[in-house]
């Protein structure tokens, strides 16, 4: 059964022969060409699942061919073959939309694996997704049960102007939820004003919130409206409300009770109609117990509580969020959006993400710029992501997380200049497997050999080689 169609274009007949033989042996249907013009002629009647093109060819070179193919068949993955001296050209190929590049001389198994990835990616693009990704203009993405609860609350409050308190760790998207609450409310056409309590010096918070009269303090040369007046008729979002000083909390409570306030240095009351949405990453109940937050203000704000889960509690959303952020980053940078290899998606879902959705978004921006190929592989992920990926208790590790951790170890070792990684890693891997199998069989060697897929003589030899006799 054919697994896909691969086309090969190279003016070197030996390269064409080697690749055709390897890919045909892997179950692919192959067609070879000597020039880019031959490929373009063939594309008028049929289309492969992947094209491998040399970068240096007489007449039309690989980059010119790539450019024309992307204009006619933008989804067709093109793998550029290049000598080591052509790395600058390979970068240009990525910029023009190459799926990946294959450096010469290449390992034939790696070449087949790369072609397989490209074909899988292409064929997946041809099939409709069960759950279409929200466009980059969509505000909140989430299919996890905890996020569905958030959506239900937003829906139920769509006809209300009641106060809402949003709880969640930093980076979980509290301001996005506040925007959504405003946009789906009767106040949607009125202003949405946001103010971060933690970002304002304490001596300026009152002026920011309530405004000031001319001459109220040094530098107050004109009358200034505060955030409450700016948000009149709409919504005022007070982020990090837990950092609000106690004296300002008292004034805020009065505004919420009376609907009016005085500007700093003013004597005439200012009446406003404002909906308050507050957010914090702190435990406000604990702040109340510690005397750092007014209990009456807490109850005034805590009419409806929305809890935003950390990213580690909604792992099923991570692949979709990552694809969404890759689309946004590509749009911002004016490039084609990167694609995630399935193993990369799995690796992302295993990570701790202490910075939550914001950290994932920044990672996707980084990958859009720094990932080598059009498809993001696990080795493309920044190494610092894995520093928090290993659980304190090894028994908590997911079944296939060892592969990601092994890849990360190899990446660090290579960056440090290590060589002969296989000779270093293989004995440790075999020792671990042997120890585990022998423990599982209570030291019964023949049974341990069977579990490992070895013969008894092989196990005996390994025990001797590894000094485990």
Curated annotation (Swiss-Prot):
It is found in: Cytoplasm. It comes from the Bacteria. GO terms for molecular function: ATP binding; ATP hydrolysis activity; phosphorelay response regulator activity; sequence-specific DNA binding. SUPFAM superfamilies: CheY-like, Homeodomain-like, P-loop containing nucleoside triphosphate hydrolases. GO terms for cellular component: cytoplasm. Residues 445-464 bind DNA. Keywords: Activator, ATP-binding, Cytoplasm, DNA-binding, Nitrogen fixation, Nucleotide-binding, Phosphoprotein, Repressor, Transcription, Transcription regulation, Two-component regulatory system. Its main location: cytoplasm. Residues 5-119 form the Response regulatory domain. Phosphorylated and dephosphorylated by NtrB. InterPro entries: AAA+_ATPase, CheY-like_superfamily, Homeodomain-like_sf, HTH_Fis, P-loop_NTPase, Sig_transdc_resp-reg_receiver, Sigma_54_int, Sigma_54_int_dom_ATP-bd_1. Member of the two-component regulatory system NtrB/NtrC, which controls expression of the nitrogen-regulated (ntr) genes in response to nitrogen limitation. Phosphorylated NtrC binds directly to DNA and stimulates the formation of open promoter-sigma54-RNA polymerase complexes. This is DNA-binding transcriptional regulator NtrC. It comes from Klebsiella pneumoniae. The gene is ntrC.
């Amino acid at each position: 059964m054919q697994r896909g169609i691969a086309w090969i274009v190279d003016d070197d007949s030996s390269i064409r022969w080697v690749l055709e033989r390897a890919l045909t042996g892997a179950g692919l249907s192959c067609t070879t060409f000597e020039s880019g013009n031959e490929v373009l002629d063939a594309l008028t009647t049929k289309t492969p699942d992947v094209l491998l093109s040399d970068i240096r060819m007489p007449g039309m070179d690989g980059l010119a061919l790539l450019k024309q193919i992307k204009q006619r068949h933008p989804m067709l993955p093109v793998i550029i073959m290049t000598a080591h001296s052509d790395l600058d050209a390979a970068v240009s190929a990525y910029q023009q939309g190459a799926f990946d590049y294959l450096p010469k001389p290449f390992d034939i198994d790696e070449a087949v694996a790369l072609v397989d990835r490209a074909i899988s990616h292409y064929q997946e693009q041809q099939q409709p997704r069960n759950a279409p990704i929200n466009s980059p203009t969509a505000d909140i993405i989430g299919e996890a049960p905890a996020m569905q609860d958030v959506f239900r609350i937003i829906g139920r409050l769509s006809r209300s102007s009641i106060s809402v308190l949003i709880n969640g760790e930093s980076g979980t998207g509290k301001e996005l939820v506040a925007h959504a609450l405003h946009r789906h409310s009767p106040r949607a056409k009125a202003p949405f004003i946001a103010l971060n309590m933690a970002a304002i010096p304490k001596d300026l918070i009152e002026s920011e919130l309530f405004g000031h009269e001319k001459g109220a303090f040094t530098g107050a040369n004109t009358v200034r409206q505060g955030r409450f007046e700016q948000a009149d008729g709409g919504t005022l979002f007070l982020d990090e409300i837990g950092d609000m000083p106690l004296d300002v909390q008292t004034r805020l409570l009065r505004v919420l009770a009376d609907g009016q306030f005085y500007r700093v240095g003013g004597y005439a009351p200012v009446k406003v109609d404002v909906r308050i949405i507050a957010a914090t990453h702190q435990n406000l109940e604990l702040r109340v117990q510690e005397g750092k937050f007014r209990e009456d203000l807490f109850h005034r704000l805590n009419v409806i509580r929305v809890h935003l889960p950390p990213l580690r509690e909604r792992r099923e959303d991570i692949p979709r969020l990552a694809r969404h952020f890759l689309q946004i980053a590509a749009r911002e940078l004016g490039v084609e959006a990167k694609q995630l290899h399935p193993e990369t998606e799995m690796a992302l879902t295993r990570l701790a993400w202490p910075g939550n959705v914001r950290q994932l978004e920044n990672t996707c921006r980084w990958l859009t710029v720094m990932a080598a190929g059009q498809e993001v592989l696990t080795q493309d992920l920044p190494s610092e992501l894995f520093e928090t990926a290993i659980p304190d208790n090894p028994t908590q590790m997911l079944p296939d997380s060892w592969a990601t951790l092994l890849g990360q170890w190899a990446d660090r070792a290579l960056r440090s200049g290590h060589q002969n990684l296989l000779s270093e890693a293989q004995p440790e891997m075999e020792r671990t497997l042997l120890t585990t199998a022998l423990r599982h069989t209570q030291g019964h060697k023949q049974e341990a050999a069977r579990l490992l897929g070895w013969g008894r003589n092989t196990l005996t030899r390994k025990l001797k080689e590894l000094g485990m006799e």
